[in-house]
From Swiss-Prot:
Entry protein name: UPF0434 protein BB2007
Lineage of the organism: Bacteria, Pseudomonadati, Pseudomonadota, Betaproteobacteria, Burkholderiales
Superkingdom, natural source: Bacteria
InterPro entries: Trm112-like (IPR005651)
Organism annotation: Bordetella bronchiseptica (strain ATCC BAA-588 / NCTC 13252 / RB50)
A Gene Ontology cellular-component term: cytosol
Length: 62
């Protein structure tokens, strides 16, 4: 994921910062505990497509 794109993208729910998790191919919002998938290099920034991280440990920066 391009760092320039990461500088622009924000969580669609809270407008907070996102972290790219390379191993899971996801953009993670730690504030909302949501992980947005990245498919074929395209971030899917829809709340309905996000995976909840509530039951998991906090995401670690990659």
């Amino acid at each position: 994921m391009e760092s320039r794109l990461l500088d622009i993208l924000v969580c669609p729910v809270c407008k907070g910062r996102l972290e790219f998790q390379r191993a899971q191919a996801e953009l993670v919002c730690n504030a909302d505990r949501l992980a947005f998938p990245v498919r074929d290099g395209v971030p899917i920034m829809l709340e309905a497509e996000a995976r909840s991280l509530d039951a998991e440990a906090p995401a670690q920066p990659s």
